Amino acid sequence: MKNVTDSFLSLGPWPSAGSFGFNTDIFATNPINLSVVLGVLIFFGKGVLSDLLDNRKQRILNTIRNSEELRGGAIEQLEKARARLRKIETEAEQFRVNGYSEIEREKLNLIQSTYKTLEQLENYKNETIRFEQQRALNQVRQRVFQQALQRALGTLNSCLNNELHLRTISANIGMLGTMKEITD
């Protein structure tokens, strides 16, 4: 406090103690007035200013604390969202893999059933070919047999006469008779 008083004394000439009045010299009174106002402000305003600064400091600290809490909550929500995202990505990957597996399985089943159908068609074709070959062979055999029979009949008819015919029948009847006697 002594420093403040000394600073007032050094500012300029003071009027004598016996006279009290107004100094109209603006340049002489301004520094004195300013120093008085500053002194009063410092003396009385120190507590108010200290309280204001403390309040401001507390508000800033509270704001920082609230911001830190909000930041912590945001980080926690972000981690939860990331975990949910990872879970969903994993499930999506599983669905994708399962979907591809299911598609591949269906594709293989379709290919296998197509091969089986083709194999059955090939078997039916081969059976039809064999059947047609057999039928053609039977027709050829029948035709050959008919032609051979017609030639044989033609040959027999041209070679046989009634007398030879009667002798052949008598010989066959004789053989049948002897066979009957043997069996009795």
UniProtKB/Swiss-Prot annotation:
Keywords: ATP synthesis, CF(0), Chloroplast, Hydrogen ion transport, Ion transport, Membrane, Plastid, Thylakoid, Transmembrane, Transmembrane helix, Transport. It is a single-pass membrane protein. Pfam families: ATP-synt_B (PF00430). It comes from the Eukaryota. It is found in: Plastid, Chloroplast thylakoid membrane. One of its GO terms (molecular function) is proton-transporting ATP synthase activity, rotational mechanism. InterPro entries: ATP_synth_b/b'su_bac/chlpt. The chain crosses the membrane at residues 27-49. GO terms for cellular component: chloroplast thylakoid membrane; proton-transporting ATP synthase complex. Belongs to the ATPase B chain family. F-type ATPases have 2 components, F(1) - the catalytic core - and F(0) - the membrane proton channel. F(1) has five subunits: alpha(3), beta(3), gamma(1), delta(1), epsilon(1). F(0) has four main subunits: a(1), b(1), b'(1) and c(10-14). The alpha and beta chains form an alternating ring which encloses part of the gamma chain. F(1) is attached to F(0) by a central stalk formed by the gamma and epsilon chains, while a peripheral stalk is formed by the delta, b and b' chains. F(1)F(0) ATP synthase produces ATP from ADP in the presence of a proton or sodium gradient. F-type ATPases consist of two structural domains, F(1) containing the extramembraneous catalytic core and F(0) containing the membrane proton channel, linked together by a central stalk and a peripheral stalk. During catalysis, ATP synthesis in the catalytic domain of F(1) is coupled via a rotary mechanism of the central stalk subunits to proton translocation. In plastids the F-type ATPase is also known as CF(1)CF(0). This is ATP synthase subunit b, chloroplastic. The gene is atpF.
